[in-house]
Amino acid sequence: MQKKFLITTSDIFSISGQKQFEKIALKVFRFQYENNLVYKKFCDLLKTDVQKVKSLQQIPFLPIQFFKSHEVVSNTNPVQEIFISSGTTGMITSKHLVTDVALYEESFRKGFSEFYGTIEDYVVLALLPSYLEREGSSLIYMVKDLIELSNQPESGFYLHSHDELIAKLIALDQAGQNVILIGVTFALLDLIEQHQFQLQHTIILETGGLKGQRKEMIREELREKLCKGFGVSAI
């Protein structure tokens, strides 16, 4: 049975400023403490006095290791999706158990609309080879949904078809079509090494993902390289 400190979607999606965010974050903290057995035990072992937690800085944050060793859930509803973190062969991965996929979908859809507007205005192209080749990626789940919502026949995933993707980006840009290219870092770098773009109607969304694939770069160097390669002012 669910306990007190119930959180509703209206709480989460009505946040309009820092003060309100802090208020809801503290409410979420108390909800998790009351309903999430793993988190409650963690806080109790830290001897956290829940009633004295009055700011974000005082909230104990659960280490990522717990998502590898425990089932971290805050209700008893059936698990609808299990998202698994990326990792090299043999690594123990983290698991995100989702009991309400509709809430997850509403979250990223509203987030997209907040920053970019109507999804139907864009062709969504995805260059996510390392994610597309494994099971349980929340990123693939999200991008697949955005591709479908765009309702554009040109939208889609590209695995290793760089020549086809290059031609598509150039053609869509020349036609004045708004495009969002969502790509893993190393694949975006591979793409601009193959072709230097001057894109006027394309937004580049870099998802991260360089470790083990290429030499590590500082964030500023990476952004500068990608901006120059795609001919855009920001990533």
Region spans (language model):
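Active-site glycine/GP-rich loop and adjacent strand/helix microenvironment
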Residues: 1-12, 16-38, 121-123, 130, ...
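Active-site diphosphate/adenylate-binding microenvironment
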Residues: 18, 34-84, 92-97, 104-120
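Short, charged/polar micro-motifs that form catalytic or ligand-binding hotspots
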Residues: 29, 94, 98, 129
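Flexible domain-boundary/linker segments
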Residues: 42-45, 49, 102, 125, ...
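Low-complexity, intrinsically disordered/propeptide-like segments
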Residues: 49, 65, 142, 172-175
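Internal, well-ordered alpha/beta segment that forms a basic, Gly-enriched binding/recognition surface
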Residues: 89, 104, 108-147
